[in-house]
From Swiss-Prot:
This is 6-phosphogluconolactonase. Transmembrane segments: none annotated. Coiled coil: none annotated. Belongs to the glucosamine/galactosamine-6-phosphate isomerase family. 6-phosphogluconolactonase subfamily. Hydrolysis of 6-phosphogluconolactone to 6-phosphogluconate. Keywords: Hydrolase. Its EC number is 3.1.1.31.
Amino acid sequence: MGGRGMGISELKLPAAVKVHELADAKTLAATLAHDVAERLRAAIAAKGQACVVLSGGRSPVPFLEKLASEPLDWAKVTVSLADERWVPVEHADSNAGLLARHLLTGAAAKARFVGLYQQAENLDAAALKADQALTGLPPIDVLVLGMGDDGHTASLFPASPNLEAGLDLASTRRCLPLLAPSVPHQRLSMTRSLLASAAFIALSVQGPGKLATLRAALAGNDLTEMPIRAFLHDPLDIYWCP
């Protein structure tokens, strides 16, 4: 891992957090896909259906492709997104488009997809429509989160309007409109209350930069400063590679 590199094992993590330290990005993608699929198979065996909520961005592509090739009864799986950019599915920045290209192909195309993007006159109206659409989402069996260098997760960004509502565990909202510092700014995000309801939560992070972000997140407790903190003290499985 290089002389200077610090491993994730050196972080002081809460008792409920389990760490999977992988050799490289390829191994992380394969291991996470295997573990997610195993939990989805168990959910199908137990109750006849499974629900997985995934995150967008560039880094999950190898994981999504690995997950698509896992032997699963995809017709019994509901797939949704922790957050979405308020752009049509055809847009290059669409998380739904990302899933369509890299996950919902072959056998996995049989899965039911519940997206967040809604056509509406403005972002607030779109979030209300998404909130309604999510009433049909089964209980979440598996949630896979990512984390930005600023400590955001899903589209729960520090300094965004609606962030406090998005982090409120007592909130009955499933989806809220939020603003990202980067383009496209307008986002739709599942709320913490919905995300935290997942039976199994994985956080997938790569590289020393994300390790430094995790260290900073663990050192404080202001959720609005680093929203990932909202998930670091619940049962959580962190998948990390250098």
